[in-house]
Amino acid sequence: MKIDQGKIITALFFLLIFSITFILLYLSRRKREKQNLVLLNREADKNNLRVSKFNTWGNTSIGMDETANVVFFTKKTADGDTGLQMAIAETEKCRIDNIKRTQSNEDGNYTLTEKLELVFEPRDKKKGEMAFPFFNMAYDGAMLTGELQQAEKWCRIINERITGFAQNK
C-alpha cells in the first residue's frame, strides 16, 4: 500500500502546529510562575527572609519561610500587586472563609463563590484578623480554578505549624 506524500506532509504540518501550541502554552505558564516567584521573594526580602516552600497559580502565589515560620502571599490584579505576610507565632488559628451566594435561573438554583480567603486569627485578640484573598469574583472571573484546593492545602500546612509551634513553647 502506497501512502500519499501530500497526506504525510499535511499530517506532519498539523502535528507541528499542535506541538508548537502546547510548547507556547507551557512556556507562558512557566514565565508567569517565575514572575510570581519574583514577587513572592520580594515580599520575603522585606524582612530578610527567604521562601523555602511555595505554590503559584494564575496571578497568585503563597509561600513560607520554614525556618522563621512566616507565610507570604502575593497577587497581581488590575488594581496593582498585593503583598502580605503573617508570622505563624502570632497566629492562633488559620481557617478558610468561603463566601458564597445562591442564584436562580430557569434551570434552578446554583451557588457561586464570591470570595475565598485564607484567614489568620491572631493570638492577640486586640489585633484584627488578616486575610489572604485567594479568589474574588470581582477580579478573578466567575470560576474557581484550583484556588479552593490551594487554600485547603495551605490552611492544613499552617495549622500543623501552629500546633507544632504551640507544643514547642
Where are these regions (language model features)?
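Acidic, Ser/Thr- and proline-rich intrinsically disordered linker/docking segments
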Residues: 94-169
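Short connector loops at helix/strand junctions that flank enzyme active sites
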Residues: 66, 88, 113-115
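Anionic N-terminal interaction surfaces
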Residues: 5-72
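N-terminal hydrophobic targeting signals that begin at the initiator methionine
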Residues: 1-2
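Short, surface-exposed coil-to-beta transition loops
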Residues: 57-58, 81, 113-116
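Structured surface patches comprising rigid loops and adjacent beta-strands/short helices at the edges
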Residues: 84-96
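Short polybasic amphipathic segments
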Residues: 69-74, 116-120
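Short aromatic-glycine motifs in intrinsically disordered, low-complexity regions
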Residues: 72-85
